[in-house]
């Protein structure tokens, strides 16, 4: 495997971001790392989140010789990026909720952010709103249950629409015309979300913007992705997880996504160098 793009998330949500990156860079190699032993991240204390993510990602970068890291998790991106960039010597890309494009797109100037409780309460999120959506009424909806519903859907192919409708009731009542999906798990539920909310609500996520950023960094940095080394059929795909075991359904989903290797990784001590 050549220097891969390493995509990281707490669970399978980052696959939505990985899919967008692969559209732009289909011949590159990829490592997908999901810390499902600590899922969902939205309920972790900030210091625990930072130390665990930095330790795990650093370990995988050293092992795989990744050329860039994509933190495909909104909750982690709000707090982990400074420490991770200080630790690593390769580009690190995070996820920014699509507040700015939502504010520009909204005709009613009533927009919403659907994210984990951790993302909703972070100062970073409120700064984004103040900076880019000051002319809008912004409703914030924090929900970790949707993360687990997305995980369940990927693992089993099933999703409880009745429960989803209950969860989204406040969103429906808010009378929005644009809803930002502020968790990378939520695009996995896009069809069901649209079904409940109706076509009058536009759903926005950050996947395409992240892919563009990765492409730009690789093309203009030392790790050039656009060369003959990558002009081959397909790419090598490896996945790593932290939980003791994963379901057969999830393993099948990952295989269907193109992952040829699936391996559990034991995290090192967060204080180790």
Curated annotation (Swiss-Prot):
The gene is murI. Gene3D superfamilies: 3.40.50.1860. The lineage of its organism: Bacteria, Pseudomonadati, Pseudomonadota, Gammaproteobacteria, Alteromonadales. Provides the (R)-glutamate required for cell wall biosynthesis. It comes from the Bacteria. Keywords: Cell shape, Cell wall biogenesis/degradation, Isomerase, Peptidoglycan synthesis. The keyword Metal-binding does not apply. GO terms for molecular function: glutamate racemase activity. Its EC number is 5.1.1.3. This is Glutamate racemase. It is an enzyme of class 5 (isomerase).
